[in-house]
A protein has these predicted regions:
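Hydrophobic alpha-helical transmembrane segments
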Residues: 2-28
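Hydrophobic alpha-helical transmembrane segments of multi-pass membrane proteins
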Residues: 24-34, 151
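Amphipathic, interface-forming alpha-helical segments with heptad-repeat character
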Residues: 51, 70, 77-181
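Short beta-strands and strand-coil junctions in structured, solvent-facing domains, enriched
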Residues: 54-55, 110-113, 188-190
Length: 200
């Protein structure tokens, strides 16, 4: 095997260091240019860091030239929504209820979304469920007398309170809450029949 390698390379002359300089420079220059080129899709941004320091956020869609030797992390600025898990909580009167909500949100500050929390998507989900628990426990499920706000009778008010609380909790992650709606509300199965009979 070694004999074949020696025979194959015997006709190749040994280039001097001066002959390789233009090739090395061309390769280095090409690497720098390609490290600066980035394609940004609609609804996406690129958070740019230069050796660990935040430089800025590229928002213009299409082909862009950024600083070479930078790291670029994609952050979506599209509108997102998700439905919380169905939570079992006690209302203000101590009755166990099931409640869930739909949260519509969007990243407003890409730097905060990238650096303030580990995962802004997980953060939004956890904080939304925590806010939903808090709001659900501060109101009764129903108000038969009609004197106060209840989860069932004042859904717009409760949704507004929930939107405000979720927005306050996720602001640190650079997230803006666009809309919140209660998607599921019911007494827990173990007391649902008894509460239905009481209402009748």
């Amino acid at each position: 095997v070694w004999r074949i390698v020696v025979l194959a390379t015997s006709g190749v002359r040994n280039p001097s260091a001066g002959d390789l300089t233009p090739i090395v420079l061309a390769v280095v220059l090409a690497a720098l240019v390609f490290s600066a080129v980035v394609v940004i899709q609609p609804g996406q941004t690129k958070v740019v860091q230069f050796f660990g320091r935040y430089v800025g956020t590229a928002r213009r869609t299409g082909l862009s030239m950024l600083l070479p030797l930078t790291t670029k992390r994609g952050v979506s600025v599209r509108v997102n929504n998700f439905e919380t898990n169905v939570l079992k909580v006690n209302d203000a009167e101590g009755n166990p209820v099931e409640i869930a909500a739909i949260i519509v949100w969007q990243v407003a500050d890409t730097a905060k979304a990238s650096f303030a929390v580990e995962s802004y998507k997980d953060f939004v989900k956890v904080q939304s469920e925590a806010a939903l628990r808090h709001v659900a426990t501060s109101h009764p499920y129903d108000d038969p007398d009609g004197h106060g706000e209840s989860l069932r009778g004042s859904t717009d008010v409760v949704s507004g309170e929930l939107a405000t609380e979720v927005a306050e909790r996720v602001r640190v992650a650079g997230v803006e809450v666009l809309e919140v709606r209660i998607s599921h509300l019911a007494y827990s199965p173990e007391i649902a029949q008894a509460m239905l009979q009481r209402q009748q």
